[in-house]
Structures are given as C-alpha cells and as structure tokens.
C-alpha cells in the first residue's frame, strides 16, 4: 500500500498572517470611512492628518490608504511558500502546481471583469481591475518562485525595480505633450502602453492605475511577500519567533529608507506603482507582519 504523505510542520498556517489579513480586510471593507467620521467629531491637527491619510494622494505622494492593496498582495505572497510546501507534501507534480497557479490567477481576473460589469455588455468596459492585478501579479510571481532559487528570486526583484525605474525615466510616452514630465499621467510610458495595448476603457481615459506595465513592479511586491514567507518557513527550527520578528523589522526599516531616498529621483506613486513605492510598502508590510508575528507567533491550524 502506498504510504500517505504527511503534512510538514512548516505548512502550518500562521495566526499572525490571518490576523494581519483580517486587519487589512477591515480597510478593504470601508473601515477608513469610519475613521474619517470619528476624526470629524474631534477637530484638530492630528485628527485632520489621520483623516487625510484615509484617502489616496492625487498623484505623487503616500498615505495609509495606499497600503491597503499592496499589503493584501504582499500577504498573498507570504502564504504561498506554506501552501506550496503542503501541496508538494501531498504529492503534487510540477504540472499540478502550474495548473493551480493559472486557475487562481484566471479566476481573479475573471472576477475583476465581472465586478467591472462584464455581464452588462456595456462596451467599451474597463478591463483592468484590482482583482485582475492581484491575479496576474501573484500568478507571475508564483511561477518565478516555483522555477528559481532564492538568490535568483532576489535578483529578479532587483532587476524589476531598477529596470522599471530606468524605463520610466528614460522613455517618455511618444504621444506626450511637449514638456510633459516623464512621471506625469500625460507623459509616462505607462499610460501610453495602456492606450496602445490595454483592451477596453482605461480608468482615467488616458491611463489606468491597474494597467499592464505597472503590473510588472506589482509582481515584485508579491515576490517580496513570498521571500518573506519562505524566510519564516525555512527558519522555523533555527530561529526563535522573536528573532525572526526582529530580522523582519530591520528589513522593514531598510526597505522604508531605500524607498524614501529613491523618492528623491523616482517619486513614490501608487498609481504608477513606482519602485520607490514598492520599497516603502514592502517596509510597511514587513513591519506590520513583524508586529503581528511577534505578538501572536505560530499556531496550529
């Protein structure tokens, strides 16, 4: 009789990850509106600043509201190494893993299209979506994670961030108005690619914040989450929970500093998903995960 594979301890779910996901879901479900209303009950400089952080900047800049989407993508990345280890322990083949990745990515893209009004048949509809970006970015990151070792994965993330910076800095939109900044909505190559290749209607007519080219650095966000999850999984026996939380907190500080310094030449911008934005939200996500992890540590399913 063929022995039944057992589930490794490393595939146990992290209560801290579930708690962080729940925290993020609060804001996805509209908790920011409640925060703003409470702030209005107590006028003042601090409450005004908190209320302002519950909305997106018009273009360049950063607020707490900008962290909700990338944190969710980062969390999806963290959980993948645990899911992958479990699938492999149950005998999944490489083909099985590919099919599961593609199915999940395709379903998220489909759900995004449905949310945008697929069944209303009101063409041209918007085809890009938050769910679609999560599906595409996560699936591409999972494919890369599946096929490369850790050092190569880190190199890929670095190449994406530096390459995206170079592309946006050096290649303006061919149809940009004279004098348009390469990081403006009118002048960026990101919007040009949307107008050229993105089916349907972009969100801003000339640009879509969940468009094609800006999904590439979102892949880096998902991969950074996967690298974090792999670090936690592989260091289970070697490091204490507090030590792992400390290392993640230090990495959070490093990423945040890199993002702030990079902002001097490559503005932090969620709609463009700039490389500086990737670094800052990676710092935020790592810091939040370290905080939740330190408080809750491991738990059995």
Where are these regions (language model features)?
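N-terminal signal-anchor module of multipass membrane proteins
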Residues: 3-87
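Transmembrane alpha-helical segments and their boundary/interface "anchor" motifs
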Residues: 66-71, 86-116, 123, 127-164, ...
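Transmembrane alpha-helical segments
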Residues: 76, 80, 136, 140-144, ...
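Membrane-interface helix caps and helix-loop-helix hairpins in membrane proteins
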Residues: 119-127, 265-272
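A conserved active-site cap/scaffold subdomain adjacent to cofactor or substrate pockets
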Residues: 210-229, 246-250
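Long, well-ordered mid-to-C-terminal structural blocks that present hydrophobic/aromatic surfaces
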Residues: 227-294
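Conserved small/polar residues in nucleotide/adenosyl-binding loops
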Residues: 298-301
């Amino acid at each position: 009789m063929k022995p039944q594979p057992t589930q490794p301890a490393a595939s146990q779910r992290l209560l801290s990850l579930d708690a962080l996901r729940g925290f993020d879901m609060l804001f996805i479900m509209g908790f920011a509106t409640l925060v703003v209303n409470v702030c209005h009950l107590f006028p003042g400089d601090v409450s005004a600043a908190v209320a302002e952080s519950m909305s997106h900047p018009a273009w360049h800049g950063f607020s707490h509201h900008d962290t909700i989407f990338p944190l969710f993508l980062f969390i999806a990345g963290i959980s993948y190494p645990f899911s992958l280890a479990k699938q492999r322990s149950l005998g999944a083949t490489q083909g099985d893993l590919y099919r599961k990745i593609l199915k999940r990515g395709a379903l998220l893209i489909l759900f995004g299209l449905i949310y945008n009004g697929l069944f209303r048949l009101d063409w041209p509809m918007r085809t890009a979506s938050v769910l679609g970006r999560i599906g595409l970015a996560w699936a591409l990151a999972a494919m890369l994670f599946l096929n490369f070792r850790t050092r190569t994965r880190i190199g890929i993330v670095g190449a994406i961030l530096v390459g995206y910076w170079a592309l946006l800095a050096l290649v303006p939109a061919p149809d940009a108005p004279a004098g348009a900044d390469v990081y403006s909505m009118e002048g960026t190559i990101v919007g040009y690619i949307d107008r050229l290749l993105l089916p349907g209607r972009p969100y801003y007519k000339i640009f879509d914040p969940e468009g094609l080219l800006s999904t590439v650095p979102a892949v880096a966000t998902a991969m950074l989450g996967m690298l974090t999850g792999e670090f936690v999984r592989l260091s289970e026996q070697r490091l204490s929970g507090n030590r792992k939380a400390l290392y993640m907190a230090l990495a959070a500080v490093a990423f945040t500093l890199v993002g702030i310094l990079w902002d001097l030449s490559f503005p932090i911008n969620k709609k463009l998903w700039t490389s500086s934005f990737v670094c800052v939200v990676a710092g935020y996500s790592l810091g939040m995960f370290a905080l939740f992890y330190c408080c809750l540590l491991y738990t059995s399913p």
